[in-house]
Amino acid sequence: MALVERKEPGLFENSYKITDELPNGETLPYGGASITNFPQNYAVNAYGGTSGKQTGYIRESNVSINYGSGVICEGFIACDYRSNYGDSGAPVWNGIAYVGMQSGSSFNSDGSWAGMSYAMPTTYITARRTESFFWFTTF
């Protein structure tokens, strides 16, 4: 997993480059290591486009998210780092490895953050890189 940085204006793939540097100049650790076991209370960081760098803990793994209308996404990691609209796709990591990618958050009816953010594990991203990006269970 890596970040993509836009090198120059343009519509073609060659206008982007892979980088491990965050917009604040900080560098992500160890260029691509990932973990497969997600213990509770494991400290993680996320760097979202809206929220910037946030720190929190894994609260639960293998979480299903109900989007309504019978659409349920499975296998996410629930974390308590703060995230907001516009943070989707952010890297989630600890001090030595990538954990996943910011994929969703819980919000109150007034639009305020409800205390939980959801990351798609790196193991799912790499296993499904040639398949559809999201997988759904419909009832």
Where are these regions (language model features)?
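Serine endopeptidase catalytic core focused on the charge-relay Asp
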Residues: M1-N66, W93-G95, V99, S103
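Arginine residue identity/basic-tract feature
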Residues: R6, R59, R82, R128-R129
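Generic structural motif recognizing short loop/turn segments at the entrances and edges of beta-strands
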Residues: N14-Y16, N24-E26, V71-I77, S112-M116, ...
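Long mid-to-C-terminal scaffolding/interaction modules that assemble large complexes
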Residues: I35-F38, F76-D80
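Helical hairpin unit composed of two closely spaced alpha helices linked by a short loop
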Residues: I58-C79, G89
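Short, small/polar residue-rich loop motifs at catalytic or cofactor-binding pockets
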Residues: N84-D87
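C-terminal subregion of chymotrypsin/trypsin-like serine protease catalytic domains
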Residues: N94-F139
